[in-house]
């Protein structure tokens, strides 16, 4: 992937939700909710403060993050559906 986000934006690939419940019931795709977790694929350099200094982002490539179901802008790149969002749209990093 050759996308380089600008400023405080990140590129996230949604992680797929389970399509089957613990009891074995298959959830049809049109009834499943959008996943609200993803993996960070790229990060911008950061946001400038009032002094013009760049403040680095708190997330890094490979982080698993939580975000709102309707956060970000969806883009298609080489057949993959990705999200471009500001770091402020992220709720948390999932620690391993």
From Swiss-Prot:
Family of the protein in this entry: Belongs to the GroES chaperonin family.
Function: Together with the chaperonin GroEL, plays an essential role in assisting protein folding. The GroEL-GroES system forms a nano-cage that allows encapsulation of the non-native substrate proteins and provides a physical environment optimized to promote and accelerate protein folding. GroES binds to the apical surface of the GroEL ring, thereby capping the opening of the GroEL channel.
Subcellular location: Cytoplasm
SMART domains for this protein: Cpn10
Protein name per UniProt: Co-chaperonin GroES
Domain of life of the organism encoding this protein: Bacteria
Pfam families found in the cross-reference section: Cpn10 (PF00166)
Record GO terms (molecular function): ATP binding; metal ion binding; protein folding chaperone; protein-folding chaperone binding; unfolded protein binding
Subunit structure: Heptamer of 7 subunits arranged in a ring. Interacts with the chaperonin GroEL.
Keyword ATP-binding (UniProt): no
Gene3D superfamilies: GroES chaperonin
One record GO biological process: chaperone cofactor-dependent protein refolding
Species: Delftia acidovorans (strain DSM 14801 / SPH-1)
Keywords tagged on the record: Chaperone, Cytoplasm
Cellular component GO terms, alphabetical: cytoplasm
């Amino acid at each position: 992937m050759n996308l380089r986000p600008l400023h405080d934006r990140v590129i996230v690939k949604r992680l797929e939700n389970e399509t089957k419940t613990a009891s074995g019931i298959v959830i049809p795709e049109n009834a499943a909710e959008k996943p609200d977790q993803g993996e960070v694929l790229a990060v911008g350099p950061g946001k400038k403060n009032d002094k013009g200094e760049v403040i680095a982002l708190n997330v890094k490539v490979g982080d698993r993050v939580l975000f709102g179901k309707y956060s970000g802008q969806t883009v298609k790149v080489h057949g993959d559906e990705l999200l471009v969002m500001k770091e402020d749209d992220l709720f948390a990093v999932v620690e391993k």
